[in-house]
């Protein structure tokens, strides 16, 4: 067969939840590309939810905080060059209470996240990035706001919340609390409590959190931190900025992206949707590799003319037990089928 021109590939990927980290996925793609003589830049990405801390350098500190239901929790976070990166799930996450079944959706508090922010301030952080996602809480951030004793110091800090959703403040209960174990009656109670929290923030801090897109992230934590002066930023944009995504995209011939499950939410600010959009704007060919692709997402990909593969469809149960191998095989198959990417 004709020797293929080497292609510069950008592996800009999210985690495959439960089976492979974003870094492992990027590595698998790179190994497959390199075995065929192509160059590959590995760029693990995240959307502000779980996995963001890992993508932005990983934790280098551990603190004891109060977990969502009052029990002590050991939270990992990062402080480097006066930039703190805090993943709220480490302090106030649903996984700390054993999932929805072990949660008390009404009692669950963000106090531990506030304690981490307070500690970051005490240690001299000049920039604080709070990543939301995976929360047990719908307290509107009241627990965190109370725990931040040094909030006057926040005025001189670049304070950013990386939001993984665009949900509005008062909608947080109805949209997400059922996944955190809330009954219908509790959802109504939590909605009323969010209304009260919004009134409180407006009266005390002069900030109308109801008007902010993304303020409902992590059960309204994003809104509470916005009341203290945080900027709410789409998580993907923040991560892409930190890791130099735009420059890497401009420099490549082909983009490969992917995540564990592709569905309608993938196009609402999540990694794959954003990478597909960016590649389209830059007129770069793109391949999407996912564990599973639901029918809506499949239709969207067809409409956009984007090459896509579902591992589950092609490899069955191996897609879960040997995810990175399946990813590498998919990449190799694609590169052989489509020799001329340019």
Identify what each model region corresponds to.
Residues 2-342:
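N-terminal loops that bind phosphate or other acidic moieties
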